[in-house]
Amino acid sequence: MLDEWILVSPHRAKRPWQGQNEKVAPDNRPEHDSTCYLCSGNVRSNGIKNEEYTDCYVFENDFSALLQEEVLFENHSQPLFQQKPERGINKVVCFSPKHNLTLPEMELADIEKVVKTWAAQYIELGSHDYINYVQIFENKGSAMGCSNPHPHGQIWAQSSLPTQVEKTQKNLLSYYIKNNNSLLKDYVEEELKLQKRIVIENKHFVVLVPFWATWPYETMIISKRHFGNIIAMNKEETSAFAAILKGITVKYDNLFETSFPYSSGIHQAPTDRVLHPEWHFHMHFYPPLLRSATVKKFMVGYEMLGEAQRDISPEQSAEILRNLSDIHYKANS
């Protein structure tokens, strides 16, 4: 996908650990927190009051990284210093009014509302003539830098293709031109034959640990049918996507019986008004935890200076996740 190699070293997993241990967040959050900027009816830090929302709630980020007005700057004559203006829109998507929930604990019907909200935002944001890519993502847990525990994600829509997306598109397009088929469709069909890295499967989607996975329990959700973006899903596929989202996040929580941190995001076709037959809808999950609820994988040293390295094989990770219960551990307590 990115033309990058991964060093796999499963023999390192048992080395002694005297390094940093993550703090496990207390599991006693109220359903509504009067001090939370994202809870229904509360006033945010900029003085704007949230609506008394009952399911998904979307608003423009009060601290947007991207501005809708183009920022002008002086161009450098020296080609070693290259820069360009960027425009965009940042939004926050509250998944639920309930402060004490996360995606795996939500009802399936409510997760489906989140998926439909993502689709509506893809259409709305992509309709702007200067928006060429819509990045939907979630940072869950303080270990992934999440600034608020209320269940929420973000959408960053911008005029340029982000670097990771641009690299992915380049490789998807190269494969499509050479093989007249989707790279990810061919890939998921091969994985389904082998079954070694499959975690969950339903009629329309597959969750697997990718052959090239970097993070210990990294997974991808890949559609079985070839389509390029979230709005191409039919009603049945939307329900199936919500179900498999719940399925993998429940397994994540069950792994160490904790609210499992991760960064996740959808990769899909740009909104640049060009046909993109090379794009195949998929979603990435990058969780940092390695050995327990308190020990995470650090991408430092060799990983920063050389290439990514993992301490457990993709096949081992897939087997561990696959064998976990589909019922959330809290439901059994």
Q: Where does each model-flagged region fall?
A:
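Extended C-terminal subregions enriched in glycine
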Residues: A240-S259
